[in-house]
């Protein structure tokens, strides 16, 4: 297998608005990130993916960009960004930029021009269609609720926005649009960034017939079959690779919701000349109800395990996995997949990390995950800031599909704001995130969960993550070893072996709050070394009773 730096890296995702505020305005910023580079170096991560920091009206927290070559004023200046790059590189840390090119903000100069008239030179930068029978061109619904089309009275036409109406979709069929994007990417690569995480990149190619979508319990049709992994997607990404990516030593990861194993190989196969890896969301999207993620049901562990094993086995040797359990769009991983009850929070956070970091692929740590930060469980609608949560609350309650009480429970479990509360640095007011009033409330458990306390405690979640990351740097088997699943049908245990030449590694995790019984594979009963354990287990007999949420890793050469 070909060795590359991005296969051997551990990526840390920063959501800049909530990471560290350096000037007391309640909003995280670039100087705040610079202040914390030594903390990140101590953790051991060597790549930072930073969510968008470019000029934006912040309708969707920066995923609505109004200028691709300017830093958002509340985050700082271009000079600050250049300092961040230099300081990170000095510490051996690379920087990935969040590339948002499925859509722009409606305040981007291209769109301001585009909507002026039907013959404006920028008209074809976006997707405009005539009304059909005085209504929307088709029945597609947007990701954040409502129609995916917005009527513009000035020219009596509709524009497409798969996300909010302030996020009009770019028309990738137009070669001028593609040139603009590639020029902009080259601009940032020349500045010295180390790669791109590509936001909803699988949506840039649309079926130009724009047919109606299937109605799935909602008010609108599903655009998925016509604009996710669309007809020209691989042609566009190959062109992007030729025009930009192949010229630099950069890392790329595409956000590709709904991707299959076969499709992932097209995006990220070694011989494809498109991307290095993709984010698949199959394990994240399990446990959906009639209205997608808006449900109070727990996830199905066996289904989760089956999906994780499938991606390990079927992508092996063909494309590279991205390993993650959380990001800025998901609830906190310890609340979703572990147990955030204080009795089990730390051990289940360590167990989840063990399970993920011993697999083949590039692991991603979302800010605060290394501390075991939990969902915030806001119980008042006015505390929420997330556009998706607020849109769906209105849509699903006003149409009588869900009661306000039930929808509040769904938000507490599934809202994106769970991941967006401020980073918990210490026990001071504002959790050390800000000296001012934070843009969103701090999780009240910052007194118990914070970086300052964990840095002092050798048994903390932070130090456990640090050790997992160090092991990955030291041992090729963790990065490149083959994967073999054990206990496929067990209701509680997730266990697997990794192999590289004469070396073997066994990872065992109990995903439940009950004890679980297992037999060690014979190879590991004698002379195996315990690399890491979340409960200090010393004795590894043939028969083992695992404690709730226990995890350990054994190594044999």
Residue positions per predicted region:
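Active-site and adjacent substrate-binding regions of carbohydrate-active enzymes
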Residues: 1-529, 533-557
